[in-house]
Amino acid sequence: MTGDRELQALLRLTAWLSPAFPIGGFAYSGGLERATADGLVIDAASLAAWIATLISHGSVWNDAVLLAESHRQQPSPAFLAEITALAEALAGSRERHQETMLLGDAFVAAARAWPDEVFERLPGKTAYPVAVGAVAGAHGIGLEKVLVAFLHAYASQAVSSGIRLGVAGQRDGVAVLAGLEEHIVEVARRAAASTLDELGSATVQADIASLRHETQTTRLFRS
C-alpha cells in the first residue's frame, strides 16, 4: 500500500503542475516578452541563461523558498496568511503581483478536486507558491519532489513562451529543458534546506523588464 500511495502522490503532483492544469499559466511570461523586445533574450542560449538565472537568483528562487516554507508550515492558518502577505510584498511589479495571486486562486480552485482540510487553512487569496507548497505538504508529497516539479513547470512554461516569441524553435526548446535538469535539481535541493532568511534576488534586468511590460503596446502575454 505504501507503494500505491507514493504512486498516487506522483499522479497528483504531475496533474497539479501539468500545463493542462487549469490555472492559465500560459498567459504569463514573467517579463520574458519585454526582455525579448529589448534584445536581452535573442536565441536558445540566452533563453536558457535567462531561465537559469531566475531559478537560482531571481523571482523563481524566492517562489521556491516560499513554497518550501509553506510546505513545512501548512498546518498553521496564521502562518499561511503571513507568508502570502510576504509573497505579495516580494512581487516586483503590478503584473507580477497579479500573476502570483491569480495563479494561486486558480490553483486552489482546481485542486479542490482532491478534498483536504488544508483548503480551510488557506487565506481567501493565496499566492501561487504558497498554495502549491501547502496543498502538496498536506497531501504528504515530499518537499524535494514538489520543488523539482515546480521549477521544471516554470522552466517548461518559460521555454514555451520563448518559442511563441520566436527566440527558439521546438527542438531548441527541448534542448534547453534537457540542459536545465541538473540546475533544477541543485536549486530544488538548496531551496528544500532554505529558510525565509534566504529570500532575495539579484536579477535587476528581469525586474525592470517586468515593469516595462506594463506599458508595452503590442503583446501576447499578461506579464
From Swiss-Prot:
<keyword id="KW-0143">Chaperone</keyword>
<dbReference type="GO" id="GO:0005737">
    <property type="term" value="C:cytoplasm"/>
</dbReference>
<dbReference type="InterPro" id="IPR002639">
    <property type="entry name" value="UreF"/>
</dbReference>
<keyword id="KW-0996">Nickel insertion</keyword>
<comment type="similarity">
    <text>Belongs to the UreF family.</text>
</comment>
<comment type="subunit">
    <text>UreD, UreF and UreG form a complex that acts as a GTP-hydrolysis-dependent molecular chaperone, activating the urease apoprotein by helping to assemble the nickel containing metallocenter of UreC. The UreE protein probably delivers the nickel.</text>
</comment>
<comment type="function">
    <text>Required for maturation of urease via the functional incorporation of the urease nickel metallocenter.</text>
</comment>
<dbReference type="InterPro" id="IPR038277">
    <property type="entry name" value="UreF_sf"/>
</dbReference>
<dbReference type="Pfam" id="PF01730">
    <property type="entry name" value="UreF"/>
</dbReference>
<protein>
    <recommendedName>
        <fullName>Urease accessory protein UreF</fullName>
    </recommendedName>
</protein>
<keyword id="KW-0963">Cytoplasm</keyword>
<dbReference type="GO" id="GO:0016151">
    <property type="term" value="F:nickel cation binding"/>
</dbReference>
